[in-house]
Amino acid sequence: MRLAVTGKNGQIALALKAQARPDVEILTLGRPNFDLACRSTVASSIRDAAPDIIVSLAAYTAVDKAESEPYEAFAVNRDGVQALAEAAAGLGVPVIHLSTDYVFDGAKPVPYCEEDRTGPISVYGRSKLEGEFAVASANPNHTILRTSWVYSRYGQNFVKKMLRLADTNDELNVVADQLGCPTSADDISVAVMTIARRMLSSSSADLRGIFHLSGSGEASWAAFAKYVFSVYDEITGRQIKVHDISAAEYPTPARRPANSRLHCDKLERTFGIRLPNWEESTRRLVWALLLEGKDA
């Protein structure tokens, strides 16, 4: 199986490369030779890669910065993704596209299903939703995976930020009134491989469309931080106090949904995939980062 993976330096792309089996060839695409904001590079890069399937991970992910750079966000998350999906369709290649929980407004009191009405409240969320529309219209042979609160040993993410802050702080204020599903990039990569194999082995329409893919369980940012620091305490013997605060007490340029929990039963029914509990995957990562030094 030959995968072309965009966003070569992102968390999920790096996790895919790290976990690839010998029978899987992963071609990672990224700047400067491949840039979603430059449509002219997209089609030629995909044609040269000659993949069996494309995993679309590249995105403009600076949620707050997008509020002042909407053109740049839409150029990548909508227009670039459309060019990618069109190129794939021209070659008869299926696309797995990663989207986000931020396509929802957060007003629903329970986890969101795939069929629920979207209503993004940030430029980033709107650009990602438009990207979903672009993929669906350009290439019917697609699977869109909405995920959330991604963390890993790679790049910048919440777990690594908390551990960095622990170096110089004994107490931290963390938002407690936003709920979501922390999701390990390693777990996502395993799921993506399974989905790719199924898509290549079957043309069933049931395997196409939108699916929610997130870690089992739920947490607020504060609860997430407290769990990270509970594992940190086990390893180091040092306690970090987390104080719950409201989102209003921690203003940011972009609004975040108060609830972006994702209901993932459709994914399990269709592909037999249910990701591990987020606490299990978080514990494994914190131990790796602190004891094994597997940082990137």
From Swiss-Prot:
Q: How does it assemble?
A: Homodimer.
- Keyword Oxidoreductase annotated: yes
Coiled coil stretches, renumbered: none
Which residues are annotated as site, described as Could provide a fine-tuning to achieve optimal pKa matching between active site and substrate? T100
Could you say which cofactors this protein requires?
Mg(2+)
**Residues the record lists as binding dTDP-beta-L-rhamnose:** T100, D101, W149
Where in the sequence is the signal peptide annotated? none
Q: Which GO terms describe its biological process?
A: dTDP-rhamnose biosynthetic process; polysaccharide biosynthetic process
Identify the Pfam families for this entry: RmlD_sub_bind
Cofactor remark from the record: Binds 1 Mg(2+) ion per monomer.
**Record EC number:** 1.1.1.133
Q: Pathway of this protein? A: Carbohydrate biosynthesis; dTDP-L-rhamnose biosynthesis
Leading EC class: oxidoreductase
Binding-site list for NADH: G10, Q11, I12, D35, L36, A59, Y60, T61, Y124, K128
NADP keyword on record = yes
Similarity comment: family membership: Belongs to the dTDP-4-dehydrorhamnose reductase family.
* Record lineage: Bacteria, Pseudomonadati, Pseudomonadota, Alphaproteobacteria, Hyphomicrobiales
Q: Where does NADPH bind?
A: Q11, I12, D35, L36, A59, Y60, T61, Y124, K128
Instruction: Show the GO MF annotations.
Output: dTDP-4-dehydrorhamnose reductase activity; metal ion binding
Q: What does this protein do?
A: Involved in the biosynthesis of the dTDP-L-rhamnose which is an important component of lipopolysaccharide (LPS). Catalyzes the reduction of dTDP-6-deoxy-L-lyxo-4-hexulose to yield dTDP-L-rhamnose. RmlD uses NADH and NADPH nearly equally well.
Q: Which residues form the active site?
A: Y124
The species is Sinorhizobium fredii (strain NBRC 101917 / NGR234)
Cross-referenced InterPro entries: dTDP_dehydrorham_reduct, NAD(P)-bd_dom_sf, RmlD-like-bd
NCBIfam families cross-referenced by the UniProt entry: rmlD
**Protein name in UniProt:** dTDP-4-dehydrorhamnose reductase
